[in-house]
């Protein structure tokens, strides 16, 4: 009987692989809540973070295929509820949670995404009143961006036909919910701006859940409305529904029907507006006539006593005459002073005077230059004489004149200054002051 069973030795990789298999098999899907920390979002699109509570923590990873579906942006410190499976990162032997879905605690993911986008766009100024464009009073052509089969388009057309049947309506059908809806809505808004065939635009749909209305909360739609040169009226959902599009639009209507009522007045309202304008015009004309009659009466009263009017005019003429005389005297005095100043400057700047002064200066410069050159030449002569004397004293010719000669050894013509440099029989070249001679060495002595 064996005391111990046969040992099964595992490598570290095998051990981690076995643990991973056990965990993934028994924790295929779990829901975990906690606070997010150490969030990292590299360019790969994956999310890496730690989920923790007061007593423990676990590493989590959410791969790009899952993270790209998030409607909101996770942040450190945010409470989350996550769904995922437990696995092991074998190279480090660490267990982790592979997250497939997450949502914020206490508030839905879509609601949080709505709040985050609203705050960001508000900081950028997309909701500012200064950017809102006025809605035209009597539009001739109206563009509508909505579903071609929904109730919204029927409500809009019914109201427009009932209130003012002559207005033209251009419909740009789009998807208003589901994947790709936001892109279609934004493209339709830009198309209307590209062709500029309408005076005002209604963008909307009927009511629904937050998920149904979500296309109108997408950033791409908000920016298309903000960039539109054509006034935009948002008409999304019911009265209680607010979307990002409502905040960016130039005017918000609680329903599509209300949008049609806002953009086109009824015939009765137009008639009432015309009556009001007529009444205001009559009042303005009456005030204008009253002002004119007041002016006429004032002139009539003034003409009843012409001497009074002429007296005021004569007094004003006298005053103006005195002011003109004084102004002329001041002007003449200033002109005289300026003329005297210019005459003095002209005298000082007389070309003949300047030429004479220049001539005198030039003659003085020439005399000084001649004296200077004479002194320099004399110094140069003296220096040359001294140098010539020194050169003559040092010249070999002067030495030869005293009876000396220059001895060179043939054939290399090397100068001989010592008897040790020659041997009997050597040929020598002798140079005298005048001419020279060749000789042979017979004997030498020290």
From Swiss-Prot:
It holds the Pfam family Exonuc_VII_L. It is found in: Cytoplasm. Its EC number is 3.1.11.6. Disulfide bonds: none annotated. GO terms for cellular component: cytoplasm; exodeoxyribonuclease VII complex. GO terms for molecular function: exodeoxyribonuclease VII activity; nucleic acid binding. It comes from the Bacteria. CDD domains: ExoVII_LU_OBF. GO terms for biological process: DNA catabolic process. Belongs to the XseA family. Heterooligomer composed of large and small subunits. HAMAP family: Exonuc_7_L. This is Exodeoxyribonuclease 7 large subunit. It comes from Geotalea uraniireducens (strain Rf4).
